[in-house]
Amino acid sequence: MKRVVVTGMAGVTAFGQDWPSVRAKLQAGRNAVVAMPEWAIYEGLNTRLAAPIADFVLPAHYPRKKTRAMGRVSQLATVATELALARAGLTDHPVLTDGRTGIAYGSSIGSTEPIRAFGVMLNDKSTASITATTYVQMMPHTAAVNAGLFFGLRGRVIPTSSACTSGSQGIGYAFEAIKHGYQILMVAGGAEELCPSEAVVFDTLFATSQMNDNPELAPRPFDRQRDGLVIGEGAGTLVLEELEHAQARGATIIAELVGFATNCDAAHVTQPQQETMQLCMEMALAQAGLKAADIGYISAHGTATERGDIAESHATAAIFGDKTPISSLKSYFGHTLGACGAIEAWLALEMMQEGWFAPTINLTEPDPACAPLDHVMGNGRMLAVDYLMSNNFAFGGINTSLIFKRWG
């Protein structure tokens, strides 16, 4: 089996596109959530909160020929990937285009504006709203295909459209592709664009925050006063590489990916199950050859939903007790759906290198219905971590767990 390392990583978030910018916002202890008064036009939509990326602009050097089939979700994915490849020292490298580099990337759905166009067609009985690229922008694998085409990646394409585990499964399946010798390099991650149609999905489940007048107080993962999640948007990309290839080309190695597991609850499409969440984490530990005590930090899924936080906390505590530091980055960016697993893995690795781990903001009184955990609160925590775990869970009962090892 091949060893797999991270040689590049980047993202596009509501806090910026680089670690110094994101770190400054994390350390300020404020979230990216804002009121969305424009959503008032949707009768029956209760939440008016989101965490949009307000300043995203497609780079001027992107040619129209390569972007005309991109919706916003593909644009976010492509920019995050360009930044990650640059950090890996792979911009215009021949390995990208000789078949040895693939892509495993996902989003919950494609872009949402094309869906509206098809709705107009069905309602008006006219195809006037449809163009040659409408479907390509909305297809479930649009982010993987567009990012792959943009950089000329000729290896395997693994689209991961699995809701909130799209990004983490992308990383995990990329890891497996390299580990088993199918590819030398993999671009991996996830993206999501903001749309009120995503908010209403959770609204109908009574799972969205109603703190419309106090966006700075939501979401509140694991807190007694939490009242639901907030939708966000963004993209995250990791460049995974076979260790010997990375060393041969003199790449800067950020971390090693040593464990990945994914499984399914097979119980209920929207109600998470503690037992299989726990099993997923145990499987990742077993693959990495680690004990629970070896993990120095856990990046929680932490959505701030009632059932999700309870199930996750009990699954985590059953393995780690209350001794392993844990926090949820969704308290800052909201739930970025298909992007969250990749964004959270990227930022967890940045924090491991920094030695400072962000707290779960708005967590002031842990819910007694949740299992006791070592929540990172307040101003964050300085930690020397050799291994970290990043967990994500999704509709359909899909669970993922990734384990990264500090390099050097």
What are these regions (language model features)?
Residues 1-66, 88, 244-256, 346-360, ...:
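ACP-dependent fatty acid/polyketide chain-elongation machinery
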Residues 3-7, 31-35, 213-288, 297:
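Condensing-enzyme catalytic core mediating Claisen C-C bond formation in acyl metabolism
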Residues 6, 27-162, 191-199, 294-308, ...:
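Conserved beta-ketoacyl condensing-enzyme motif
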Residues 8, 26, 81, 103, ...:
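Conserved small-residue
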Residues 10, 60-70, 105, 125-137, ...:
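Cysteine-centered functional microenvironments
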Residues 35, 182-227, 260-274, 302-309, ...:
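Acyl-CoA/ACP chain-elongation machinery
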Residues 77-90, 140-143, 148-191, 230-251, ...:
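Active-site-proximal alpha-helical scaffold in enzymes
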Residues 124-131, 172, 176, 193-248, ...:
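Glycine-/small-residue-rich "gating" segment that lines the acyl/pantetheine channel
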